[in-house]
Amino acid sequence: MRTVKVFEEAWPLHTPFVIARGSRSEARVVVVELEEEGIKGTGECTPYPRYGESDASVMAQIMSVVPQLEKGLTREELQKILPAGAARNALDCALWDLAARRQQQSLADLIGITLPETVITAQTVVIGTPDQMANSASTLWQAGAKLLKVKLDNHLISERMVAIRTAVPDATLIVDANESWRAEGLAARCQLLADLGVAMLEQPLPAQDDAALENFIHPLPICADESCHTRSNLKALKGRYEMVNIKLDKTGGLTEALALATEARAQGFSLMLGCMLCTSRAISAALPLVPQVSFADLDGPTWLAVDVEPALQFTTGELHL
């Protein structure tokens, strides 16, 4: 018999996380613990209001399948009974973790993947004044970060970006607008970013406005985040985006994430691996995707005042495995 525990946790941040759609001071996560024959498997998710999720709705979704879980629900069956999203993610990752622990293997070994000893991860520069953002970028660079992800909204774009690039002339920069821009003026903004040597622009437009990217000539790659959840989205992204950001909370777990990675690459997309504000538990579950991606943005746990134990080993801009 398999037992199931489901609970919420709130992890305070050491610094407010400010993006185009608001500011957060804590990471709220939902955790699933499965136990079978004395072995425990754990999965974590971060409910996201942008996708119509709350802690309560995700908990309810998880509780709705507890009877099946107790009877031995498999990962394959899970994909059919819950939609992609945070709830399925926590369950899917708990099932993967349980399987790995039962085999006394790491998750990567179970899947047959070799992980690097060190992963270069983006460090996030959150929204602030141009000077604040430049200072943040400079501090991160001096501490060892080589890849910086700059959060922008619809204001002071050139001022912020010029200040940042002046502060860190040699850093690799990617920019995330979190759907805050509009099609009007996008070409000029893309050119500005390209002129500043920005490596990639993530989700400039609201997902429902993606048609504006059709036949849009742009001088740097554009990555789909809010527009890409599962393999079912890929057809609509073709010709509009060059890259997709895979997050387990969007795919509904590692099972669909691995399938999405394979299919996206087969269709010519580059990959980014992202995360929500989360603990090391959530990052550990996503690690098997690392060898396939061009950019890893896994700094969620580094925003926490205290991480879960045992925590992954982060230094500024790097994750050590």
From Swiss-Prot:
Q: What does the record give under GO molecular function?
A: L-Ala-D/L-Glu epimerase activity; metal ion binding; racemase and epimerase activity; racemase and epimerase activity, acting on amino acids and derivatives
- Catalytic activity annotation: L-alanyl-L-glutamate = L-alanyl-D-glutamate
| Entry keyword set | Cell wall biogenesis/degradation, Isomerase, Magnesium, Metal-binding
Question: How is the co-factor bound, per the entry?
Answer: Binds 1 Mg(2+) ion per subunit.
Could you name the active-site residues?
151, 247
The cofactors required by this protein are:
Mg(2+)
Where, by residue number, does Mg(2+) bind?
A: 176, 202, 225
* UniProt keyword annotation of Hydrolase present: no
Lineage top rank: taxon: Bacteria
Q: InterPro entries given for it?
A: DgoD-like, Dipeptide_epimerase, Enolase-like_C_sf, Enolase-like_N, Enolase_C-like, Mandel_Rmase/mucon_lact_enz_CS, Mandelate_racemase_C, Mandelate_racemase_N_dom
Q: Name one GO biological process term.
A: amino acid catabolic process
Pathway terms, separated by semicolons: Cell wall biogenesis; peptidoglycan recycling
What PROSITE patterns does the annotation carry? MR_MLE_1 (PS00908), MR_MLE_2 (PS00909)
Residues the entry annotates as binding substrate: 124, 149, 275, 297, 299
Q: Which SMART domains match?
A: MR_MLE
Q: What does this protein do?
A: Catalyzes the epimerization of L-Ala-D-Glu to L-Ala-L-Glu and has a role in the recycling of the murein peptide, of which L-Ala-D-Glu is a component. Is also able to catalyze the reverse reaction and the epimerization of all the L-Ala-X dipeptides, except L-Ala-L-Arg, L-Ala-L-Lys and L-Ala-L-Pro. Is also active with L-Gly-L-Glu, L-Phe-L-Glu, and L-Ser-L-Glu, but not with L-Glu-L-Glu, L-Lys-L-Glu, L-Pro-L-Glu, L-Lys-L-Ala, or D-Ala-D-Ala.
Complex and partners: Monomer.
Entry's family note: Belongs to the mandelate racemase/muconate lactonizing enzyme family.
Q: Which PANTHER family does this chain map to?
A: D-GALACTONATE DEHYDRATASE-RELATED, ENOLASE SUPERFAMILY MEMBER DDB_G0284701
Name of the featured protein: L-Ala-D/L-Glu epimerase
- Organism this protein belongs to: Escherichia coli (strain K12)
